[in-house]
Curated annotation (Swiss-Prot):
Name of the encoding gene: rplX
Species whose genome carries this gene: Tolumonas auensis (strain DSM 9187 / NBRC 110442 / TA 4)
A GO MF label: rRNA binding
Key words of the record: Ribonucleoprotein, Ribosomal protein, RNA-binding, rRNA-binding
Keyword Ribonucleoprotein attributed: yes
Subunit structure: Part of the 50S ribosomal subunit.
Keyword rRNA-binding: yes
GO biological process, one term: translation
Superkingdom of this protein's organism: Bacteria
Protein name: Large ribosomal subunit protein uL24
Any one Pfam family match given in the protein's UniProt record, by short name: KOW
Length: 105
């Protein structure tokens, strides 16, 4: 199945503690059905120092993955999250917003 949400897409979170927040997709984990979104689902990790690699220890903040069903592509025309469909235009498969039919940029 084709990916409805891709890297660099702007998405809005539908559920959870970050509900309503927007961010840019930095990574798509296809096998797990998850995405990593900038500034969303930030977790703290206790990092041990590794002097051989020059890595300092401490508490590091890192974005954790969010299930793809908990985010929707942000439609700038409506200002809301929207569903995405596919259609062919000039022999190319393109994504479009289902609410107003505009192409996803």
């Amino acid at each position: 199945m084709a990916a409805k949400i891709r890297r660099e897409d702007e998405v809005i979170v539908l559920t959870g503690k970050d509900k309503g927040k927007r961010g840019k997709v930095t990574k798509v984990l296809v096998e797990q059905g998850k995405v990593i979104v900038e500034g969303i689902n930030v977790k703290k990790k206790h990092q041990k120092p590794v002097p051989a690699l020059g890595v300092a220890g401490g508490i590091v903040s890192k974005e954790a993955a969010v299930d793809v069903s908990n985010v929707a592509l942000f439609n700038p025309a409506t200002g809301k999250g929207d569903r995405v469909g596919f259609r062919f235009e000039d022999g190319n498969k393109v994504r479009f917003f289902k609410s107003n039919g505009e192409l996803v940029k």
